[in-house]
């Protein structure tokens, strides 16, 4: 289905708005993928806050022009799905995890912090824990000494309570 000029401008504006707030873009080839698989991928992306879209490459090139992601333009060839996220690792994680399950999704490239990433670098980025995971680990590490101290104090209080009960 071809788009008229106004529709194309609207698509470019929508993508440019997503790109303006994004930290990461991941580009994956999707030849021969079944509709049910693409639906699962879209649902997973939505859960993780990743904007996932199949676009005409010329429209995608226009949307990323004059942004830190402009270096990806050379990689925009063939049938591609674009994962765009504000979280530095979410798009890479969603597409990389799905590519492990469905071999019809092939990661081509990505861009983070103005640098174009290859397939191996996108996989590395996907292996990094998300910000929320890191914060929960940090909180656990900070709480561990406090909860340990609380258990020790409770055990001491319990022991003193037993000692007083025996003396009475």
Swiss-Prot record:
SUPFAM superfamilies: Ribosomal protein L10-like. The keyword Magnesium does not apply. Keywords: Ribonucleoprotein, Ribosomal protein, RNA-binding, rRNA-binding. The keyword Ribonucleoprotein applies. One of its GO terms (molecular function) is large ribosomal subunit rRNA binding. Pfam families: Ribosomal_L10. GO terms for cellular component: ribonucleoprotein complex; ribosome. GO terms for biological process: translation. Belongs to the universal ribosomal protein uL10 family. Part of the ribosomal stalk of the 50S ribosomal subunit. The N-terminus interacts with L11 and the large rRNA to form the base of the stalk. The C-terminus forms an elongated spine to which L12 dimers bind in a sequential fashion forming a multimeric L10(L12)X complex. Forms part of the ribosomal stalk, playing a central role in the interaction of the ribosome with GTP-bound translation factors. This is Large ribosomal subunit protein uL10.
